[in-house]
């Protein structure tokens, strides 16, 4: 007998697309898609989303084709978010949409790129990839004749900027000025938690990057399976895989361990979230926002294990000499280009040069920052070569 289709009833605190707070600019509704599904499709069709395929997480593209890029990471986050939202009875389209958007504002070369742009923009308003993501979807993407940005629903925008929790403590930072300005016109409730769907997207990001960094670290030879045996969470899982499947080679052993670790983290989030929902008595999406704590979360034991896993990854991967060397090269590339473009804006491409005109120095710096932040790793390397290596003239 065939199994019945998997079905979880809609949770009372799930977002209801038919009750969306709408879009900043009024549009006719789609006859074939919910508002949240429409947001998802708009994000997928952006140039910023396409460029994620050549923006890297830790390893620069020329180091190999087997490592994650921002695009593959984003797709993994979206898959986990959609599955987790479905299992919790939440709106899967909204969770997936926020997951797909969450990294759109990342510059080339991962966190090294963000660190360098923050330094270069320190006197001009700063740089924050979350704010840049918000600006991408509300300002920098211009694909429609009647408005700038993507005109996403209120719920998606709220999730983009608040998926990690309330942000009022950040509003004093110069880099968050754009958020404060937008909030004055289109209130996003920056002092409250976001929807359960947005919180799912945030946890899906944690699940995806912790697991794929273990995977990429082993693949790159930065650490071995034996090194992982004493690390919380992954160590016991590896031991179980080796005991149960001694026939597996090292590659399949570590892949099976990563698969089980994803499952363990998903199960933990589900159990903790359902416990918190029952304990708090939430009955609506607004009840979720009114809580003084996250609804979607890891258990305290899992959170502790993940903190120790991240500590291991920080020491053995993120600060490995090979990664440090790449970070140094990446920061030099972006820093030198930023200084040149700010000093000589006439060498910017025509469209960007036009944007830089009739602005003060801070305004020109923001245009330069936007141009660089939108680059892929490969394009940044090539642009730097053209600008600074005279051998290209030969």
Swiss-Prot record:
It comes from the Bacteria. Residues 70-210 form the HD domain. Residues 25-36 have a biased composition (Basic and acidic residues). The keyword Secreted does not apply. CDD domains: HDc. Residues 1-36 are annotated as: Disordered. GO terms for molecular function: dGTPase activity. NCBIfam families: dGTP_triPase, HDIG, PRK01286.1-1, PRK01286.1-3. Belongs to the dGTPase family. Type 2 subfamily. This is Deoxyguanosinetriphosphate triphosphohydrolase-like protein. It comes from Caulobacter vibrioides (strain NA1000 / CB15N). The lineage of its organism: Bacteria, Pseudomonadati, Pseudomonadota, Alphaproteobacteria, Caulobacterales.
């Amino acid at each position: 007998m065939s199994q019945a289709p998997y079905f979880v009833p809609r949770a009372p605190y799930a977002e209801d697309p038919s009750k969306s707070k709408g879009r900043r600019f009024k549009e006719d509704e789609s006859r074939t898609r919910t508002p949240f599904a429409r947001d998802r499709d708009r994000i997928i069709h952006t140039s910023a989303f396409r460029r994620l395929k050549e923006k890297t997480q830790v390893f620069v593209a020329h180091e190999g084709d087997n490592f994650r890029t921002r695009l593959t990471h984003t797709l993994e986050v979206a898959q986990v978010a959609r599955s987790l939202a479905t299992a919790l009875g939440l709106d899967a389209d909204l969770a997936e949409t926020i997951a797909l958007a969450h990294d759109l504002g990342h510059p080339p070369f991962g966190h090294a790129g963000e660190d360098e742009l923050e330094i270069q923009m320190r006197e001009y308003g700063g740089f924050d990839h979350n704010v840049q993501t918000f600006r991408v979807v509300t300002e920098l993407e211009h694909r429609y004749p009647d408005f700038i940005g993507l005109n996403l629903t209120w719920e998606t925008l709220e999730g983009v900027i608040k998926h990690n929790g309330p942000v009022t403590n950040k509003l004093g930072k110069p880099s968050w000025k754009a958020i404060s300005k937008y909030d004055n016109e289109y209130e996003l409730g920056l002092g409250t938690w976001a929807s359960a769907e947005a919180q799912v997207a945030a946890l899906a990001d944690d699940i995806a990057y912790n697991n794929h960094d273990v995977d990429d670290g082993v693949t790159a030879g930065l650490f071995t399976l034996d090194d992982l045996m004493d690390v919380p969470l992954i160590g016991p899982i590896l031991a179980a895989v080796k005991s149960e499947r001694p026939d597996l080679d090292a590659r399949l052993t570590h892949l099976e361990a990563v698969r089980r670790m994803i499952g363990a983290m998903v199960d933990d989030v589900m159990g903790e979230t359902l416990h918190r929902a029952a304990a708090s008595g939430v009955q609506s999406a607004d009840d979720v926002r009114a809580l003084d704590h996250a609804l979607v979360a890891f258990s305290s034991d899992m959170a502790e294990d993940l903190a120790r896993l991240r500590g291991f990854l920080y020491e053995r991967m993120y600060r490995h000499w090979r990664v440090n060397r790449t970070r140094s090269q990446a920061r030099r590339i972006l820093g030198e280009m930023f200084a040149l473009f700010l000093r000589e804006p006439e060498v910017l491409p025509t469209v960007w040069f036009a944007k830089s005109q009739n602005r003060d120095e801070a305004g020109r710096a923001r245009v330069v920052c936007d141009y660089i932040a939108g680059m892929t790793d490969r394009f940044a390397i090539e642009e730097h070569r053209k600008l600074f290596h005279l051998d290209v003239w030969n």
